[in-house]
Design a protein with these regions (language model features):
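Acidic, surface-exposed loops and disordered segments
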Residues: 1-245
Length: 245
């Protein structure tokens, strides 16, 4: 397979995992996948939080490792990109992951990692080895968020016509995880070849979710760079403009 085909396969393979075995991936594996190369990702020391758990209220079973996503509000898009790049690298190694935005103890995590002034822990990523069969809680969670039901690519294109050569990248965006499966990203295609990216005002995780989706797009189409989106559309939040090199 070509590198692009490999990346697409990893994106198609990735599923949110909530039922893990008791085998915990090492911090070295997490770091090799990008957990410490980003200023927004911090491996949670299991010893510092006691019993290796971050208070996930029964949503997560088993003993995965945890990576805290720590950033300021205006850094959430890049934090989402960096976090999902790590997720894809872990997926390629056969390690399951799950983004957690609300179902964990922020206090417990904040006490275990360094949080810069003005920043906060916006999410954690659980990473571990998936159990062969999903537990009851996981099955209920997947049903409640309609995890296997996603919008069509055409549903998040709000203007212009997407070039056919971007079909794979846009399908990768469609497969990106998001809080409650809301998929808050919207794309507008310009005649110049640039793409204006917006977010719907859904919840406090919107910018993080758009960053996660952008990680998928840029993984498949790395020859785009991000710049400021100066185009206003009512009821949408301008996130970035993607410009082809």
């Amino acid at each position: 397979m070509s590198n692009k085909d490999s990346i697409i396969h990893v994106i198609e393979t990735r599923k949110s995992v909530r039922s893990f075995t008791d085998e915990t991936p090492s911090a070295d594996i997490l770091c090799r996948c990008g957990a410490e190369s980003s200023p927004y990702l911090k491996v949670v020391d299991a010893a510092a939080i006691g019993n290796g758990r971050v208070g996930t209220y029964g949503v997560i079973s088993g003993r995965p490792a945890y990576v805290a996503v720590v950033c300021k509000d205006d850094e959430q898009v890049q934090a989402g990109i960096d976090g999902e790049r790590m997720v894809l690298a872990l997926t390629e190694l056969g390690i399951g992951t799950c983004w957690l935005g609300g179902t964990f103890s922020r206090q417990r995590v904040t006490e275990a990692v360094a949080v810069p002034d003005g920043a906060r822990c916006v999410a954690v990523i659980a990473a571990g080895y998936a159990r062969q069969h999903r537990g009851l809680v996981e099955r209920v969670m997947r049903t409640s968020v309609r995890a296997d039901h996603r919008m069509c690519v055409s549903d998040f294109i709000i203007a212009g016509v997407a070039p056919r050569e971007l079909d794979s990248a846009l399908e990768a965006v469609r497969l990106a995880p998001s809080a409650c499966n809301r998929q808050p990203w919207r794309f507008a295609f310009n005649l110049s070849g640039s793409i204006d990216v917006y977010g719907t005002p859904s919840d406090s995780f919107m910018k993080l979710d758009v960053g996660i989706a952008l990680a998928h797009f840029l993984a498949v189409q790395p020859h785009y760079r991000m710049t400021e989106n100066t185009h206003y559309i009512p009821k949408l939040t301008a996130i970035t403009t993607l410009i082809p090199d």
